Amino acid sequence: MADLLNIILRFALYIDLLLVFGLALFGLYSFNTLLRSRPLLRGMAVTGALLSVAGLVLMTRAMSGETQLAALWPHLQMMVLETDVGLAWALRMTALAIVVIRPGLWPASLAGAIALASLAWSGHGAMDEGWLRFWHFLSDILHLLAAGAWLGALLALVLMVSGRIGDTRLRLIADAVKRFEWVGALIVLTVSVTGVMNYLFIVGPRFDGVLFGTYGLLLAIKVLAFAVMLVLAALNRFHLGPSLQRSLRDGQHLIAAKALRRSVVMELALALLIVALVAWLGTLSPDPG
């Protein structure tokens, strides 16, 4: 039960921090007023802080064996003040506090990036040493930031294409899709390269034996889901996006908007599945034994 709760907390925290950064970043190159809502960013930052506290308590309980708050408190202090994980946690809480106090898009993007990057200290990179530790953390952080930019853009587009779409809103959607093209290409490249690097850091240049354990099975599902996401992203980029642009000229935008909505919703669902798998994978060893 504790392991399941840990995975659920990790999933919720990952989703929250990915979106704090991703939505704020998307809002910088989009004119969607929803993404400029300060209560939205504040609420997500507060949620992230609460999830971070819950995650720290759960981790400390598992490591110390204590269940009563009075007995657990010294261990919590030691965790925060004397470990790298605790330092990353404190940095995350500070960054989230900045989002609450200054929820503008630029402050939220920068602070959200710091909060999201702190999750790297909860992954497999924390077990490395020396230069290997540095490069593993760098790869993890870039992977997280690219994933956050992607997830935030997907949710933003889903929100934009939901509900009744008039001519003005359609132009905003088409403009947002156009602006996301170059960002999306950079995101896909970063996620792909750092994903391969992270596999090499964790498992090494081998496949034998890895796929026969839970870790390997989940990783295979993750790679398959990512491949389908790439297909959908290519469909959006080379077919549905241009189709939406053409619909602005001929006035027949309903079919194009619905097709884009279906594709983006499917892509978002796959992204959520991947985050759930990542939350689970972070608790497992790649060794099938």
Ranges and model annotations:
Residues 1-289:
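Polytopic transmembrane helical bundles with strong interfacial aromatic enrichment
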